[in-house]
């Protein structure tokens, strides 16, 4: 006789329901349990002086090797030289570089304005002192050897200033007064007459007057001569100083020497000279300046440097530049030009620069040190956070797979009883 068909005993419902439920629960929490098993315990446990197996957890026990593997993975696949070059190009775009340079220039100007210790002024003063006192003299000494040294500049100064130079009426009057009061006062003229009328000079004048005159003047020269007259004049100038000075003063006034000198000085200009003379004078002036700069220019600039307070000049210069609208408005243009120069340089040498920067930055060692210095608890919390925030689908998938496995077990159990 055939065996009677077995029926499912629904009184044992928990045997059919528990596998899917338990499988889903186990599958859902397996990831968290696995992560905790990788990290726990954080430290080694010793019993009777012997370390308990599997303590500490797998990751704390091999944290240094893990750090090295993470560093190798990142540097080998994520932060490759090509990727770093792309990153550098994005960071060093012209607009960003220009903005950074502009910010630095503005910061420098603000720093100069608020520089109470005058450090910037001292630096600029040192630069100016070295430039004017040391570098410029050597440069001028070399340039002065050229035949055309400052030729155009000296010619321009000569043509536009010296050639057009002419004293005004007031200037000519003051210069004439100075000439008659300081250079040639009556006492100086008197002394010049005395010095001029020596016995030898008087003899020469007298003989020349006798030989070269004719007619009535010859009779006067040979009968009376000039020796006695000139001798008496010299004696009078020596013995009667005050009277001589008064006579000379009256003579200057009667002859209107002051007005004569004023007119001469007022009409004195290079334009009245012949063209050939002016050209020769201009050439002589140029050669004189060149020769002076070549021989004595260094000493002149050195003495000038020693007599100038460069710190005050530098401070005035910096204050003027920091408040100049032209400088402030040109910062953007300067930053743009510098950014373009840097861009052209980076286009050519970026690969070499990145190759040099990578060892300097030691990114791989930074990653290793950072992972090694992170406590196992912090690593565990970080991985759990990533799993919960970014890998939640895997957790849910684990629960679903556990549920499916439990359903298969229930189905197998049901079919095995039939």
Swiss-Prot record:
Topological category with respect to the lipid bilayer: Multi-pass membrane protein
UniProt superkingdom? Bacteria
Q: Where are the transmembrane segments?
A: 10-30, 394-414
Q: Which keywords belong to this entry?
A: Cell inner membrane, Cell membrane, Membrane, Transmembrane, Transmembrane helix
Main location, first listed in the record: membrane
Q: Where in the cell is it found?
A: Cell inner membrane
One GO cellular component term, please give it.
plasma membrane
Q: Which PANTHER family match?
A: UPF0754 MEMBRANE PROTEIN YHEB
UniProt family annotation: Belongs to the UPF0754 family.
What this protein is called in its record is UPF0754 membrane protein alr5253
